[in-house]
Regions:
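Bacterial N-terminal signal peptides that target proteins for export
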Residues: 1-7
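Hydrophobic h-region of N-terminal signal peptides that target proteins for export
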Residues: 10-19
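A metal-dependent hydrolase metal-coordination microenvironment
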Residues: 22-198, 206, 214-231
Length: 233
């Protein structure tokens, strides 16, 4: 398992005039994390796994951050640890991996999206999209909204309630899309995480049509319970 949080989405890109035989399905992941936030592997290693396992698209959506700028981390004291670094170095080599020891501390630089995208994307078969998990909350309830193909990082917007918090974050995404012309879309992640979001909260939203039905993290409660609907319902 590449990260603690794994979502696999498959969808068909087909016009309404196409027959069922003409429909083509594309498989990808829009919600996964790297060492840029709380994931346990390097972005290139994550992209390499998906590319090598028949996926067509990937968006690494770290919490409230884009993979840009200088970011050096402790080589051993991170979620992946020395084992992840050893695999990373073996796969990509010293010519690619930036690492050094500063005052006795082993450090490694996380590659930016602008650096790893040209190396890992394959035109026509494997698409990489810059993404962010906009991670907000209301009174301790986690409200996380994925933004796929984002252009500029968006900070959490806050709000006066669960639905209001979601709406303000969605509005920020839609405003960026309109201002930049960049194709992008938001979707609600793991609504049952922390029992934070009710169906009535999502029904009220404007400009939002998608939510995450399945998430592989053990705490997201995909299947609900006696008092809460499953995400499939």
């Amino acid at each position: 398992m590449i990260t603690k949080t794994l979502l696999t989405i498959a969808f068909a890109l087909a016009a309404t005039t196409l027959s069922a035989e003409d429909t083509r399905w594309w498989k990808g992941n829009l919600h996964t994390h790297s060492l840029w936030s709380d994931g346990d592997d390097y972005p290139e290693m994550i992209a390499d796994w998906y590319r090598s396992n028949g996926y067509h698209f990937l968006g690494i959506s770290d919490h409230n951050v884009l993979a840009e700028g200088q970011r050096w981390i402790h080589r051993e004291k991170n979620a992946g640890g020395q084992r992840a670094f050893d695999k990373y170095l073996k796969r990509f080599g010293d010519d690619w991996v930036d690492h050094k020891v500063v005052k006795g501390v082993p450090r490694v630089r996380l590659k930016t999206y602008a650096e790893y995208r040209p190396k890992m994307a394959v035109p026509g078969s494997f698409l990489l999209m810059q993404s962010e998990e906009l991670s907000d909350q209301f009174q301790g309830r986690p409200i996380h909204i994925n933004v796929t193909n984002i252009k500029k990082q968006i900070p959490p917007q806050g709000g006066a309630g669960v639905a209001a918090t979601m709406q303000k974050n969605i509005d920020a995404v839609l405003a960026q899309r309109k201002a930049t012309g960049q194709p992008m879309f938001p979707h609600i992640n793991h609504p049952n995480f922390g029992w934070a979001i009710q169906p009535a909260d999502m029904i009220r939203l404007r400009g939002e049509r998608f939510f995450e039905v399945y998430n592989g993290h053990p705490a997201v409660r995909n299947y609900g319970d006696s008092k809460h609907l499953s995400t499939g319902q």
